Each structure stands twice: as structure tokens, then as C-alpha cells.
A protein has these predicted regions:
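Mid-to-C-terminal secondary-structure elements
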Residues: 111-124, 137-267, 467-657
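Small-residue-rich transmembrane alpha-helices
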Residues: 23, 327-394, 435, 714-776
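Membrane-proximal extracellular/periplasmic loop immediately following the first transmembrane helix
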Residues: 24-91, 101, 202-209, 221-223, ...
Length: 787
């Protein structure tokens, strides 16, 4: 019965460890192979613009539309180039395939060379240039399924995009989940104004090139610099800018340095190193768990070893037998792991936020990984117990005089220390990541994000906005509304101002285009001056006449300009080519990720640049207010569906990557503690069995269960204390590494360390207490008789 129990615990421990290892391996593979799914991905680069002004620099992932044709015509190292105009940045689109409008967000314009670089599988359509003519569109298979009963027969059909007809020329496979590009609809770029007439301004396009094989990168860089100088250098220097075009390998975008206006949030390669380490640590503590349980079980197998040696078995035969047993357990663990991995695929995908491709485990490399894992676990876990058991002397084994174990006490204690260390360290990591996440979710951003609704604002809706605004406010469903070019959680548009006078320092800063009620809608804290008024709206029409306009600056901008808050109001600056008056100063608010410092910001009136309507709802009854808003919306914009986002939910979504990391840490720290507890159970079992006679005598002499618990647990808690010291060192290092990626970070209290150590200690105490109680309840008379 005991053999079955130990075998069950061994298989369970190894299975959990192997499942964890394989799940993490698939996650790491998914992240590490971002954008490597495309042919010749090692030859593909993406371009970015680097602006330098007054010693300040910005790197923006977007470039002008004229860059791609210039690359194709003037740089021989370029085999083919393409560009993407991500329309979802500015607005959603309405798609109608004959059964009514549906709003879609994953829409982009691309040129005819797109599929020569991003070679998705063509499921339907003619090979060649799919998007060479105006008003052509390619759908992914998922998008085609939404609009056509027979998606592969959609080619040749016409669909309406914002009431304009587009002909479907192809159906392609969906973009892989590990691609930084992800659209459902790809329309021909030549359908747009800049597609017909490429321009060197504005820079609203993502540009890529496939270089010729074995291209000279130094020569390519030199020619790129010459091209930039030819078309942009003189013009931008006249504005005080130095500009250069950088290029970045396609395969390093996701795990590389983040740039402004990234198409998709990037990740951090440090996370992959961390999770890879966690995977190996879980396997190691799974092996330790097996060793400890095998050691405990060996006290039950000494007679078997002695008898077999008396009957002629030699040490190699016994060694082979015990290794074979560990290999069988390892094989069982792998088989159960693959089954569990298949069954829990969806759970892990929800935890990690990535899709798991189990087919990778059936590839030659995947099969090699699984076999190597099985053999490694079998050999490493079985070697030490096999060495000890096969080395027993027959007479001492039969007489229960086990001499080999005492000499290995240091190893077993070291293994326990390591298990405690891993468990506490993972728990500490979980607490640290979670505390930073909580800090980010509860920090005062400097503006209202609760009860603020964002509505996507389409470019052709402007003429009806006044009607929408007045109707909404008449219903009391909203307190105020404001048009903006960005959500306040993520503002990226770049501008510059020149203060003039004695201060000749030009300042690069971020621009927030709004209407006059932005301060009221977001409840911004005005430190000096006054907020915008409806009279400021009239300035928009006068911009071309170089009329004076009003702007509001934040504290960071004021500091950079060397002004005080009070003296800033009324100052004149040159902003965007216009003489502008500083009308007010607002307290700094977080308009970007907390990974970055709050930078200089200018707020200015320009509703024509708006992409969003922000609506501040009254407190309480959000469903009722949204219902009223929808009724008003349908009355003003019946052709567009009512779609809304809560600002606080969008803010939380910004940190989805960190939330995924936190959930993964929670999951695997729990698994580590579970496996370590089973290993501890095995070692306590071993100690309790060795001291059964002593415990029985103490019980006869009147000892209580708590007395026995103190005796058996004292050594383990000394080991826990030693582990805690190592874990504290790890925790200090991890907190510094993890938090270094945030400009604004939480304070890590010493109580976090105490809590992690105490939690693991409690689990250990419960494990030891359970086993001790079981031994204590045995009949001492029977135990002493057996002895």
C-alpha cells in the first residue's frame, strides 16, 4: 500500500512539473519566434524616424509615405519594400456585404508589395498583385467567415467600406498570434490620396523592406542617410530638427526597444529568461521531490535489496532495476503531462494571454525535447536513490541497519533548502509583481478615468457633433463631452514649441488636440490661468491667417522651459508655426504608460483632428446612462453602431502584458509550493520512520503530539531559515530588476518578505504536522514490538 502511495505521489509530482515545463516552453517559443513565421524574415527590416532637437530625441516607428517608393528606386540593397497605413489608429470602419453595417477595427491600407514580404497563405484569389488597383480589398479567412456563408467563394464580390465599394480580390489565412501585424481587412493603398501622390509629410505609415541576400548593411545605412538628407534634411533643419531614418530587424521588433507609435505593444526579453528559469526550477524541484520520496521509501525496501543480494544479484543489476523504475515513472509522468496539457490548453491560454500551439510537440524538435526531458528526469531522479539502494550491504539491509543514508544527510538537507528557496522566491516574485500592478491600477492619474466613456469619432461625423453634444447633455446622461485626438491614457503625437526671447531652447513635446471642454470632462487640475472657452473653438478657422491661438501647458513643459507656473500664463510661444498664448497650466497627469516619465505636454484646440468623443457620466446607473446615450446616438448617427469603451477599462488593458506575467507567476509559484510540499512530505516520512521507536518511547513516557512536532520540525525550520536568507537576497534583486522598467513604482515593504516566508512556513508546518500526527497515533506497543 505504501509503495502505491509513494508511486502515486511521485507520478503526480513529476506530472505537474512536466506540464508546467512544457507549458512554459510553448509560451517562451511563442514569444521568442515573433515575426519569424514569414519567409526570409531575417532579411526584413522596419524603418523608424529619429528626431533630434535641442539635444532631445524621439524615435517614432512611423515614416512618410514617400519613403517606400524612394527605397525601391534609389537603394539597390532593397529587394522589395512595402508600407502599411493602420487606419484603426484613427477610426473604425463600417463594413457592409449586403446584410447591414458592422463596425470593424482591424483595418489597414497596404500597397501591392505587401504579400511579397508578409507571405500569408493565399486561400482564394489569383496569384500576383492582389492590391494593385484602387478599391481592392483582401480579407482574412476569419473576416470572410463573418460576412460570407462560403468564405472561399467571396473573391469577386463587392463590399462597402464606409459606403465606398471595394472588390474582394483574395482570401488569406489569418495573421499568426505571434505577429506584430494583425489585421482582418487589407485595402489597396492606392485608394487613398497619399497612395496616388506619395508625400514626405506627414509620417503616418509603417514601412518595411526585404533586403537582397547577403546585403552590405553598412552600405545600406550610408545610402539611407543620403536619401534622408536628399528629401528631408534641409526642410527639417529649417525647423530646428535633425532627422535620420533608422531600421530595425523585423524579428527584433517585439522583444526590442519600444518606439513611439508602435503598432502593437512590445514585450521584454527579460520575461522570457525569467520564465525559462522558472520552467527548469520546477523540473528540478520535481526531481528533488522524487529523490526525497525514494529516500523515504528505501527504508521499506532494505529487506528486498538484502534478499536479492543474498540470492546473487550484483550491484549493477540492482542499480539498473532502480533506474528502470524511475524511467517508468518518468515515462508515466510525460504521458499524463501531454494529456493534461491538451485538456488544460484553454486555461493556460487564458492565464498567459497567448495561444498555445500543441502541434509543436509533434514536430521533430518537439519530440526530441519530450524524449530528452523524459530521459533526463528518469536518470537524474533515479541516480541517487539507485546508488544508495544498490550499495546496501546484505546483512545490514536485512537487519535494518541502514548505513548509507546518514552520510547523505547533507544532500537531502541541501535539497530541502533549495525547494524552500524556490518556493519562497517565486512567491516573493508574485507578490512584487502584483503589488506593482495594484499600484498602477490605483494611482491617481491626475484626471478622471472612472465613469468616463470613449466613443470612436469618425472623420465624416464632425458636422453633427454639436447636435450630438447638445442632445446628450439635454438628457442628463452625461455631464460634459469633449473631442480629442487620443485617449488621455496614451497620447503620442509629437510637436515642438519655440519660446523666443532670451530662451532660445526649442522644446519637443507631446500634443493633445481637444475641444474647449476637456478640462471639465477629465477634471484636470488647473494650477494657473483659465481653461478653454467656446470662443477658442473659433480660432480653428483662423489658423491659416496666422491668428493667435491659446494653448495650455503641463508642469513638465513649464519646467523644461525654465518658467514658474505663475509667470507662464500670458507668455507667447511659437507653436506649430503659430504665435500662441499660454492660457493656463495644468498639473502633470499620466498621459502615457507608467514605464515612462511624464513628459512635456501641450493641449490645444483643434477638433478637426479628433478621433474620440469623451463623455463624463454622472455617478451611478451607468447602464441607464449608456442606454440614453445609445438612443441619442442612433438619432444623430443612425448609420453607425453605438460602440463605447470605459476609460478605466482601457487603462487596465494597457497593462495586459504585466497582468499576464502576474497570473503566470501566481500559477507557477503555487505549483512550486505544491511540489515542494510533496517533497517535504517524503522527507518527513523518512525521518518519522527512522525515529518511530524514539517517538513511541516518548509517547509511553507521556509526551504530547506537540512535543513530537517540535522535535521533528526543528531541523526543517532551521533549513527554512537558511532558505529565507537566500530568498531575501533574490527578492531584493528581483524587485530592483522588475521595477527598473517603470518610471513610477511602488514601495516594497519588508512585510512582503515576512508574508512569503510565513506562508511557506505554514505550508511546511501543516505538512509536517499531518505526518507527525499520523505517526504519533500509531500503537506504541506494536511499534516497539516490531523494533
Amino acid at each position: 500500500m505504501k509503495r502505491k502511495l509513494y508511486a502515486g505521489i511521485n507520478i503526480l509530482g513529476l506530472t505537474v512539473a512536466i506540464v508546467s515545463f512544457l507549458a512554459i516552453a510553448l509560451y517562451v517559443h511563442h514569444e521568442a519566434t515573433y515575426d519569424k513565421i514569414y519567409s526570409d524574415s531575417d532579411r526584413v527590416v522596419r524603418f523608424a524616424q529619429k528626431f533630434v532637437r535641442s539635444g532631445e530625441e524621439q524615435v517614432v516607428a512611423m515614416t512618410p509615405s514617400a519613403l517606400v517608393p524612394a527605397l525601391m528606386e534609389e537603394i539597390e540593397e532593397v529587394e522589395v519594400a512595402t508600407l502599411i497605413f493602420d487606419y484603426s489608429i484613427f477610426s473604425s470602419v463600417l463594413i457592409d456585404a449586403g446584410e447591414g453595417n458592422r463596425e470593424e477595427t482591424k483595418f489597414a491600407f497596404v500597397d501591392e508589395n505587401f504579400f511579397e514580404i508578409f507571405d500569408l497563405e493565399l486561400l482564394a484569389g489569383a496569384e500576383g498583385k492582389l492590391l494593385a488597383a484602387p478599391n481592392q480589398i483582401v480579407l482574412t479567412f476569419s473576416a470572410a467567415q463573418r460576412y460570407f456563408q462560403k468564405p472561399l467563394l467571396a473573391v469577386g464580390n463587392t463590399i462597402k467600406v464606409d459606403s465606398k465599394d471595394y472588390q474582394v480580390t483574395g482570401i488569406v489565412s489569418d495573421f499568426p498570434s505571434n505577429s506584430h501585424i494583425d489585421f482582418d481587412f487589407l485595402a489597396s493603398f492606392i485608394s487613398t490620396r497619399h497612395g496616388k501622390e506619395p508625400q514626405w509629410s506627414p509620417a503616418n505609415y509603417y514601412s518595411y523592406a526585404k533586403l537582397i541576400p547577403n546585403s552590405d548593411r553598412e552600405a545600406f545605412t550610408s545610402k539611407l542617410d543620403q536619401l534622408v538628407e536628399k528629401y528631408l534634411g534641409e526642410q527639417l533643419r529649417s525647423y530646428g530638427f535633425e532627422v535620420s531614418i533608422l531600421y530595425q530587424p523585423l524579428t527584433s521588433i517585439y522583444l526590442g526597444d519600444s518606439q513611439l507609435k508602435e503598432m502593437k505593444p512590445v514585450s521584454d526579453i527579460k520575461n522570457l529568461y525569467i520564465f525559462g528559469s522558472v520552467a527548469f526550477l520546477l523540473i528540478i524541484i520535481g526531481i528533488i521531490n522524487y529523490v526525497n520520496l525514494a529516500t523515504a521509501e528505501s527504508t521499506e525496501r532494505n529487506k528486498e535489496v538484502g534478499l536479492r543480494k543474498v540470492l546473487g544479484a550484483d550491484r549493477p543489476q540492482l542499480f539498473g532495476q532502480f533506474i528502470s523504475e524511475s524511467m517508468i515513472l518518468s515515462l508515466s509522468g510525460v504521458i499524463f503531462s501531454l494529456l493534461i496539457l491538451y485538456l488544460l490548453k484553454g486555461v493556460f491560454e487564458e492565464f498567459s494571454g497567448v495561444s498555445m500551439n500543441l502541434e509543436l510537440l509533434l514536430s521533430p524538435l518537439g519530440i526530441l525535447l519530450v524524449l530528452s526531458l523524459m530521459l533526463s528526469i528518469g536518470l537524474f531522479s533515479g541516480f541517487y536513490p539507485a546508488l544508495i539502494l544498490s550499495g546496501m550491504e546484505p546483512l545490514r539491509a536485512l537487519g535494518k541497519k541502514i548505513t548509507g543514508f546518514a552520510s547523505g544527510a547533507w544532500l537531502r538537507r541541501s535539497l530541502v533548502v533549495f525547494q524552500f528557496f524556490v518556493s519562497i522566491s517565486l512567491l516573493l516574485s508574485t507578490f512584487i509583481v502584483k503589488k506593482q500592478l495594484d499600484f498602477m491600477q490605483t494611482i491617481n492619474l491626475g484626471y478622471e478615468r472612472e465613469e468616463v466613456v470613449a466613443l470612436n469619432f469618425h472623420y465624416n461625423m464632425g458636422e453633427k457633433y454639436s447636435a450630438l453634444k447638445s442632445e446628450l447633455e439635454r438628457t442628463a446622461a452625461v455631464q460634459s463631452t469633449s473631442l480629442t485626438n487620443s485617449l488621455p491614457i496614451f497620447i503620442q503625437a509629437g510637436y515642438s514649441i519655440s519660446p523666443g526671447g532670451d530662451n532660445d531652447k526649442d522644446l519637443m513635446l507631446t500634443g493633445f488636440a481637444v475641444d474647449h471642454e476637456i478640462v471639465k470632462t477629465l477634471n484636470l487640475h488647473l494650477l494657473a490661468g483659465v481653461e478653454f472657452s467656446d470662443q477658442d473653438i473659433n480660432q480653428t478657422a483662423a489658423y491659416e491667417e496666422n491668428a493667435e491661438m491659446n494653448i495650455i501647458l503641463n508642469q513638465a513643459a513649464i519646467r523644461e522651459l525654465g518658467w514658474t507656473v505663475e509667470e507662464s500664463v500670458g507668455r507667447k510661444v511659437n507653436f506649430n508655426g503659430l504665435i500662441s498664448n499660454v492660457k493656463g497650466v495644468v498639473q502633470d497627469f499620466y498621459f502615457n504608460s507608467l514605464h515612462n516619465q511624464v513628459g512635456p505636454l501641450v493641449i490645444f484646440i483643434q477638433p478637426s483632428e479628433a478621433n474620440w468623443i469623451l463623455a463624463k457620466l454622472p455617478k451611478g446607473n451607468p447602464k441607464e446612462n449608456l442606454s440614453k446615450m445609445e438612443d441619442v446616438w442612433k438619432g444623430v448617427y443612425p448609420e453607425r453602431p453605438f460602440a463605447f469603451r470605459f476609460l478605466d477599462e482601457e487603462y487596465a488593458q494597457m497593462y495586459q502584458r504585466e497582468q499576464n506575467v502576474s497570473r503566470i507567476f501566481q500559477l507557477f509559484s503555487g505549483i512550486a509550493i505544491f511540489i515542494a510540499s510533496m517533497g517535504l512530505f517524503g522527507l518527513v516520512s523518512y525521518v518519522a520512520m527512522r525515529r518511530t521507536r524514539e517517538i513511541s518511547i516518548r509517547k509511553v513516557l507521556g509526551a504530547k503530539a506537540t512535543d513530537v512536532l517540535k522535535i521533528l520540525s526543528s531541523d526543517f525550520f532551521l533549513l527554512l531559515g537558511l532558505s529565507a536568507m537566500f530568498s531575501i537576497g533574490f527578492g531584493l534583486w528581483f524587485s530592483q530588476e522588475w521595477l527598473s522598467g517603470f518610471a513610477y513604482k511602488t514601495d516594497i515593504s519588508p512585510w512582503i518578505y515576512v508574508l512569503a516566508i510565513a506562508f511557506v512556513g505554514l505550508i511546511a508546518l501543516l505538512t509536517i504536522g499531518y505526518r507527525t500526527t499520523k505517526v504519533f497515533l500509531q500503537n506504541p506497543a506494536k511499534t516497539l514490538k516490531d523494533e
